[in-house]
Structures are given as C-alpha cells and as structure tokens.
A protein has these predicted regions:
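Short catalytic/signature loops enriched in Gly
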Residues: 80, 243-330
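ABC transporter nucleotide-binding domains
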Residues: 1-251, 320, 326-330
Length: 330
C-alpha cells in the first residue's frame, strides 16, 4: 500500500512582467511513490525543483505556481485524499499537522520571536484538538517534549534564548506533536554545525522509528541521505534522474549525474583532486531539448539532444532516466 502516489506531475511558475510572459518548468513530469514507515530522500542541486515538489505535495500551491498536469493522491488508512482538489478549509482542518507536517529550512520561520515556545504549541494544538483544560494541554505537551529528549524548560523560553540546534529540535517537536503519517523535512540541517546536525538527524530517525511514519527528507547534502534515508531520488532540472535504495545510489549509481555526485564526496585518506562537473544547471525557463543533463554529460550521444529519456526500471526498486542505460553502454 502506498502512502503517497505522485503521477506525471507538472508544476510551473507562470509570470508576466513588462508585457513579457515567462514559464519556469520547475517540476516537469515527476512520478514516484512513498510507502508507510520509510525515510525517503530527495537530492539535487539548487533550483532543481526540490522545494517546488514539496510545495505541491503539501498543498501549498499559490500563484505564480500552477499545476498543469498530474495527480497527487494520499492514502491515510481508509481515507483517500486528492491533494490537488481538496479545499483549503479541509486541508487546514484535517490534513496539515495531523496527517502531513512540515519541518521548514529555518526554525525561525516557525517560531514567533516575540512569543514563548509554549504559546506556539498552544496555537497548533488548540487549532486541531478540542482541548478546554489547560492543565491537560500542558501535560500533553510536556509528555511529547520529554519523549523526544528535550528539556521541559524550553517551553518557557523565547526563540532567541535557544541555540540554533535547539530551535530546530523544537521545530521538529512541533511538527510531530500529532504523530502525522508524513513528515516533510526541508533542509533540516542547514546552517548547523556537524555535531548539531548529527543530533538533529538522530532525532528524526528516532521519531520515525517510534511512530513508524514516513519522512520525506529534502537536502542537497548526500552525506545526510547516506546516514538516514532508505531510498533516494536524484532530481536534475525539474525531472527525476535516478531513484533507488540508498545503498544502490552510493555503491552502484547508474545515471552520469548521480555518478558525479557520489564521486565528488570526500573520502577519508583520499588526497586526489575531485573533478568538477563542467557547465551550469540549465535555465528552467528555457531548458535544453532532450535530456536536460546532456549539455554537461561526458557520455552525451545524438539521441540525448533530441529525445527525453524515459524513467525505466532497471532492477528491483531502481529507476533511471538515461539513454545509455537503455542501450546497455554504461
């Protein structure tokens, strides 16, 4: 059973300024499934479509972003939810925080700088649960905080009184207060030092293990995916380049772009110079024809310049979009 099924999703930014129309193809024909009780990683360079993808699947679709094609369907137990056609009232009342929660890139995007942490918990809990007993609310909140290994005194602190790592942990605690089926974590370790990063990642892993929910982890840091993800999707220029179990992505990558990502990772004891990838990511308002990676690919063929490669299943749970794979020349 799938928790989330995304099929042929095309989400573009359509703008018009000074009489000039512009369409940015941020997500262009993306299809994938999420399953219960897994950590699914999404990786890729900046502006590859990662953030747009999670905006759509979380129901945060606002102009100039438009969904032109595709479907985003959830299964929460016996309940089916079509995310592209649900009303905003139903989304706010029944889905957000309770079934789908969002850990934003910056913890200060969630925490109000002039309100204590306990007030932010109160806003979320009171909105989604009919709690009239303040004592019961405090007990529930302290119990949740303690379960995640956080000291209860953070509840009476203002955000500026907490370290960056502690604020991020509080943001994760807020996102998991209702034990949602899906937690979307957007660059949860950005701007944190390595030691704090490890603590935040361990917290995410512990929450997933305790609640058996699904985590969609979005980050460009491949080391983070190696540490926590069960499966990884590699995006490039709005499309899926490769999707596979984490072990396969790191030990046997098939797409040339994935191969370069893995080869660029530092290895202890290796003093060799890492080769850089020539060129720059394409402009998604005017993407190249055919395979979008072909201007930078060392194995480019004529067909790559004209024909979009299909995302094909090459072995169990391993999909690749590359003409080289189809011709068995890698």
């Amino acid at each position: 059973m799938t928790l989330l099924s995304v099929q042929n999703l095309r989400a573009y930014y359509q703008t018009r300024a000074y009489g000039i129309s512009r369409t940015v193809r941020a997500v262009d024909g993306v299809s994938f499934d999420l399953f219960p009780n897994e950590i699914y990683g999404v990786a890729g360079e900046s502006s590859c479509g990662k953030t747009t993808l999670i905006k759509v699947i979380s129901g945060n679709i606002k102009p100039p972003l438009k969904v032109l094609e595709g479907s985003v369907n959830y299964t929460f137990g016996e309940r089916k939810v079509d995310m592209l056609h649900i009303s905003q009232d139903a989304l706010r009342r029944d889905i957000r925080w309770k079934e789908i929660s969002y850990v934003m890139q910056g913890s200060m995007s969630v925490l109000n700088p002039v309100r204590k942490v306990i007030k932010t918990f109160q806003d979320i809990v009171y909105t989604h649960e009919h709690i009239t007993n303040k004592k019961r609310f405090l007990e529930k909140t302290r119990e949740h905080i303690n379960r995640l290994g956080l000291p209860t005194d953070v509840l009476n602190a203002y955000p500026h009184q907490l370290s960056g790592g502690m604020r991020q942990r509080v943001a994760i605690a807020l996102a998991t207060v209702f034990q949602p089926a899906l937690i979307i974590a957007d660059e949860p370790t950005t701007a944190l030092d390595v030691v704090v990063q490890r603590g935040v990642l361990q917290m995410i892993k512990d929450i997933q293990a305790m609640s058996s929910n699904t985590v969609l982890l979005v980050t460009h840091d491949m080391a983070v995916h190696a540490n926590v993800a069960d499966r990884v999707m590699i995006m490039y220029a709005g499309r899926i380049a490769e999707e596979a179990p984490t072990e396969s992505i790191f030990n046997a990558p098939l797409h040339p772009y994935t191969q370069h990502l893995i080869s660029s990772l530092p290895v202890i004891g290796d003093r060799s110079t890492k080769a850089s990838l020539k060129g720059t990511p394409p402009n998604l308002a005017d993407p190249p024809s055919g395979c979008r990676f072909h201007p930078r690919c060392p194995y480019v063929m004529d067909v790559c310049r004209t024909v979009i490669p299909d995302l094909v299943l090459v072995k169990e749970r391993h999909r690749v979009a590359c003409h080289l794979i189809k011709e068995n020349s890698l």
